From Swiss-Prot:
MF terms (GO), sorted A to Z: sulfur carrier activity; sulfurtransferase activity
InterPro entries: Cytidine_deaminase-like (IPR016193), FdhD (IPR003786)
Cytoplasm in keyword set: yes
Domain of life: Bacteria
Organism: Haemophilus influenzae (strain 86-028NP)
One Pfam family this sequence matches: FdhD-NarQ
Protein name: Sulfur carrier protein FdhD
Xref: Gene3D superfamilies: 3.10.20.10, Cytidine Deaminase, domain 2
Length: 270
């Protein structure tokens, strides 16, 4: 399904004449990102509705299922079907009977904001999840980060068209981009990438995201065993606390030649 549409809109522009600046109302063609409700249905029962870009939904279903603790590994899912319905899209996921029984014990309704997995959590203690502390299995040369930032920028094809999407990319330890996903929701873009990561055998490397580092972005990264998260924007205090607790390398405000290292500096060298 196409992730953008063309639409004629009105816009204004100030033009300079001999006396003053005058705002002129004109028409032009704009490109809009498609945002669509996507229902995740496990063994016939609707579990969550998220607002997403309507692409790479199999990877989204896999990544969401792992980061939400519904499954432990891709093999816990027997099949995924993407079905267009009148008001959106259903992603029909067939779970193993053991995982489906566990899901029914911890059901919640997430219908809410764009790509926000914590919205709709019924109990506060469900928000603060604990995972095993990440091992330190590599060191990354910070001199490679500049080229990674360039690759992230030039490969945001949907974002370049619409200006309305987030991107999450995965890089190996040599600075090669292995995958990139875009979505109107930053958490959804990350879930799509983490779905790819799981089915690709969990390669070593790091995530580079065009958004800020929220608590949930850190939580999803840790849940999938990725040791390093780099974001273009800032980190929140809770994200830093979560990163420190679980030994995640977290970098924010990543720019050419600089960035803020919030935690996990032991994985970095120059």
């Amino acid at each position: 399904m196409q992730c953008w549409i063309r639409q004629t809109i009105n816009f204004f522009r100030k033009t300079k004449n001999t006396e003053k600046l005058t705002a002129l109302l004109q028409q032009k063609e704009d490109i809009l990102a498609v945002e669509m409700p996507v229902s995740l249905v496990y063994n016939g029962i609707s579990h969550a509705v998220m607002m997403c870009s309507p692409n790479n939904l199999e990877d989204f279903a896999l990544g969401f299922s792992i980061t939400e603790g519904i499954i432990d590994k891709p093999e816990d899912i027997y099949g995924i079907d993407v079905v267009e319905v009148c008001n959106g899209i259903e992603v029909q996921i067939e779970l193993s009977s053991r995982k489906f029984m566990a899901l029914k014990e911890h059901r919640r309704n997430l219908t809410g904001r764009t790509g926000c997995g914590i919205c709709g959590t019924e109990q506060l203690n469900q928000v603060y999840k604990t995972f095993p502390k990440l091992d330190c299995t590599f060191q990354f040369d910070l001199n490679l980060l500049d080229s990674c930032l360039i690759d992230l920028q030039k490969n945001q094809l949907l974002g370049c068209k619409t200006g309305a999407t987030h991107a999450c990319a995965f890089f190996d330890l040599y600075g090669n981009m292995l995958a990139i996903y875009e979505d109107v929701g930053r958490h959804v873009a990350l879930d799509k990438l983490l779905g790819w990561h799981a089915k690709s055998g969990k390669p070593r490397g790091f995530i580079l995201a065009s958004s800020r580092a929220s608590y949930e972005m850190v939580q999803k990264t840790v849940a999938c065993g990725v040791e390093m998260l780099v974001t273009i924007s800032a980190a929140t205090d809770l994200a830093v606390t979560m990163a420190e607790k679980h030994n995640l390398t977290l970098i924010g405000f990543a720019r050419e030649g600089k960035g803020n290292i919030y935690s996990g500096h032991q994985r970095l060298h120059n």
